[in-house]
Structure formats: C-alpha cells, structure tokens
Amino acid sequence: MQGHVSILSVSPEAAAMIASGGRISTMDGTADEIYAKSLAAGQEKNEKLIGKVLSSGHTSVLEHCYVNLSFENVSVLAEQFLIEFRLASFTVKSRRYDVFSRAGFVSPDFPDDTQKAVFEDTVKSLFGIYDALEAAGVPKEDARFVLPYCFCSNFFCSMNARELVHVMNELAYGRGSRIPELRTLGESLFAQCEQQLPFLAVRKPEAYRQPDGFCPRPVQLLTSNAPVTVLAAPQDAEGLICSAYQ
C-alpha cells in the first residue's frame, strides 16, 4: 500500500503575515498599519521580500505561518520518525480503540520475490496473532504490541512553516532520505509547496553533506589524543570518595 501526505490548510494571508514579520523590524508604523501595507503589496511583492529575508538568515519570520497536514496510509515507522519533531502537533488514529488487523501495510522494495514473500507472510502472521489475542479478550491496547512497524497509520500534523521547511529537508536530504518511503514524503511536500507556497520550497541539501548531517565539528573534538587539562581538584579527592561509602 502506498501512503501519501497532503497540505490541508495554511494560515490565511500567509505571505502577507510572514512579510509583515519581515517589515516590522525596519519599517515605520504600527503593527496593524504594517500588516495592512503587506496586504496591499500583493502576493508577488510579499514573496520577493520573504525570499530576501530568508536569504539573510532571518528564518524566524516563517513561524507566523501555520500549516496543517494529513498523512494517509503511511507506515508507523514514518509516523514515529515524524513525531520526533516536537515543534509540531500530532493526532494519531488510536491503537487503543481502533482495530488494525485490516489496516494494510507498507512493503519495502525487495530485490527478489522470495524475500518479499517472507516479509509479507511474517506481517500477515503478526496480524493473525493480533486478531487471535483480541478474540481471546486481550484489550486492544495490549494486543497492539504485536503489530509490525510497517502497518498503515493515519494522522494529522500541524506545525509552523519554519519547522515544515526543516522537516521537508530532513525527509528529503537528512536521516529520512535513507528510507525510500520517507524520502518520497519529503519530495511530495516540496512539490506541494512549490505549487501552493513557493516561498517555503527552500531546499538545503548542502546542510547534510557532512557525514553526521551537522556542521563540521572542531578538529580537536575529533582527535583522540587531544590534551586534557585538570583546572582544579580537591586536596584529598581519594579520601572524599572513600568517605562516601563508609
């Protein structure tokens, strides 16, 4: 089963609101006056300003825009990967109340049919155990622990636009890029932003070219023989340690 992600809704007048955040720190006028000017400026002019502000590194203005997403029939692995992003809100179809034996599952691309058959037989067996436990009176909230992480999940997710840019890049270029399902979700979000919110389609592949996906570490942190200097220590350190056990 192939899952997908959809942008459901965005803050009203998103470009005008973000552009207002970019204007207020340098433009004369009250907050209401600046917002009115942004509305009057129009989409094209606001998007041009947003691009200029973002290119200067002031990405916090994106936080004035909120985006609501739906994830349909994605794996629980994808669900849990996304829930790691704590600057977002999630509401997930509950495994405590809904029956998931017929939820379907996401199957990886296998190099041969034998591996695929073993995988699918194993998953179907786990679904069968889940059904058997429920039929035996085991509560759903306990039976759910035998479900595989590939079974399909559905949930809503809301986050500010700055976090969305971060999430899209993590999916397309960061840790998520190693898993085809996650990389596909990231590319889908970028494609939707390019159509609906072009100022959010900010790709940052260069940020992930380091081996660990972060900025280069200082050389001294990578050197195992780097010197360590003891700045201070108690006079009788050994005595203090021994007294703690007497």
Task: Describe the residue ranges of each PLM region.
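A conserved ligand/cofactor-binding region detector
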Residues: 1-246
